[in-house]
Amino acid sequence: MDSDKGESQGKPETPGDESPKRILLDIAPSAWEHPADKAALQALRRIPIFDEVLKKMFGFFGEKPVRLAFQADAVHVSNKQFPEVYRLYKEALRTLDAPHEYPLFMSQTPMVNAGAYGMNKPFIILNSGTRLLLTDEELQYVIAHEIAHIMSDHVLYKTMTVLLINLANMGFPVVGVAARAVLVGLLEWSRKSELSCDRAGLLAMQDPEVVMSAMLKMAGGPTSQDRTNLNEFIVQADAYRESGDVADQVFKVLNVLGRTHPFHVLRVAELRDWVESGDYDRIVSGQYARRGEPDSAYEEDLRAAASAYADEARDLLDSITGAAMQAGSDFLSGFRK
């Protein structure tokens, strides 16, 4: 998305704008990326045959067929189609100072979800159920969350995850045991990546209550003010925070469940930790890493997180490396004619 960069710092919107949100000029994705996200991706790339599987998958499908498969049953959002959603989208792009406007589509499905997909040409799919459940501000948070997946270069791996899950559900012969190692690693990383983009969504909204309210609704379904209580949901999230290592065990259980996203209560707890650390306020005040500039502070945080994550990553790799080596040739042969 083209914009006048002005000074190399965030700045408030002008008096004529609809909100006092600070535009985060030139913000680098590393400003919001959760260190565990990067550590998990590093572990994923160490899985035997991962790179080869990635190449074979996209060589087999190709970008255009994948794009058409996602977009064939969806409506392109614009100033003429879903104009209010488009307005929210444009504002989120502006606040995060996204370098491009990515195609946004609305898909008719009651499932409350959204996703960013693609290879070289990323796009966003927004489910209509999400539009019906959430307020405009809550919906904008979801949209900003997906913009962040694109800006953080998550979409290639996100797309691969969806393809492997769908192939497995269809009984595709190469996805029974052979690709399980790669899929388990992708799911582990996918959940960590959501923590990064939750932060970006908050930066776009600059109102923690909006984000937590959206998560409350996504966790509990349709709601009204006299039936749910956001404060009670926050108390529930705080209980997770106080459980310490139990939260890490939850992530491991999710490997068995095959979830692509962490539980919403856990996400709220992680987000509150980040806000209370002071990092959120520093970014909104204009102190953040910028695109094209080195970020030594983030690199130090990443090293610390990678060290803390090492045992978990090693356990994951140990549990699937043998299967990957044994099944790798079978998986790859499934794509040969």
Model features per residue range: what roles?
Residues 1-120, 281-337:
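Hydrophobic or amphipathic, alpha-helical segments that drive membrane association/targeting
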Residues 49, 106-120, 182, 204-304:
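Active-site-proximal gating segments in proteases and membrane effectors
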Residues 76-80, 125-141, 188-192:
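Short pre-active-site segment immediately N-terminal to the catalytic Zn-binding motif
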Residues 86, 193-194, 265-268:
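Amphipathic alpha-helical transducer elements in NTP-driven molecular machines
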Residues 89-93, 140, 190-212:
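An active-site-proximal "capping" alpha-helix that borders the catalytic cofactor pocket
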Residues 134, 143-152, 196, 200:
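Active-site His/Glu-centered metal-binding helix of metallohydrolases
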Residues 147-166:
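Catalytic Zn2+-binding segment of zinc metalloproteases
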Residues 166-194, 201-204:
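Post-HExxH zinc-binding segment in Zn-dependent metallohydrolases
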